[in-house]
Design a protein with these regions (language model features):
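Short hydrophobic alpha-helical segments that form membrane-spanning helices or hydrophobic packing faces
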Residues: 127-133
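An N-terminal alpha-helical hairpin/helix-loop-helix interaction module that forms a charged
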Residues: 1-124, 135-187
Length: 187
């Protein structure tokens, strides 16, 4: 499957309307092939990798083996979620995660990249992958800050280490020409 087809398939599987009403077991489950998290990390890897790290990066996840890291996560009999959410149960934790996903997706669609930058429910890699998938080809599929900094510096951006991620994305897209044809090539 080429990247264009994969991109469209993701949007077919997870349109914004579906995301707004997504249930926890659609977000994360042990039948990995149909969950949002599986698509985000594995199925769409050709649209930029977010591999590595633990499942914590998704905010809440269904586990096979109960995590043993009480300083970072809270868990019940099926799910684990970040302690920093101060959620008393899985439903509260998922509400926080889902709100963040919707905010990121809506902000990406409207071009409000500053709002994505400010969102802190997820780490940068996860939130910018979500943003890329909903941004109508206005972002590059590069999610790691250091990679964006290197690319921007190489193309003449001064002091890329102090720039916001959305500023680096804007700059890099402008260097590609910013046309819809150039954006399609980014896929």
């Amino acid at each position: 499957m080429n990247r264009r087809t994969l991109y469209n398939e993701f949007l077919f599987q997870f349109p914004l309307e579906k995301i707004r009403n997504m249930k926890l077991d659609e977000y994360t489950n042990l039948n990995r092939e149909n969950s949002f998290c599986y698509w985000l990390e594995s199925k769409t890897v050709e649209l930029g990798s977010i591999w590595g790290g633990s499942s914590y990066k998704f905010g809440i996840y269904r586990y096979d083996k109960r995590p043993d890291n009480p300083s970072v996560v809270v868990s019940d009999e099926e799910y684990a979620w970040y302690k920093k959410y101060n959620a008393s149960n899985r439903d509260e934790a998922f509400e926080i995660v889902l709100k963040a996903i919707v905010t990121i997706a809506e902000s990406a669609l409207s071009g409000n990249l500053e709002a994505i930058e400010e969102e802190n429910t997820f780490g940068n890699v996860v939130k910018w992958k979500i943003a890329f998938l909903y941004a109508n080809e206005m972002l590059l599929p590069i999610y790691k800050r250091d990679m964006l900094e290197k690319a921007a510096s190489k193309l003449g951006y001064s002091d890329s280490a102090k720039a916001k991620i959305y500023e680096l994305q804007h700059f890099l897209m402008s260097q590609k020409g910013g046309s819809s044809a150039a954006r399609r090539e980014a896929l």
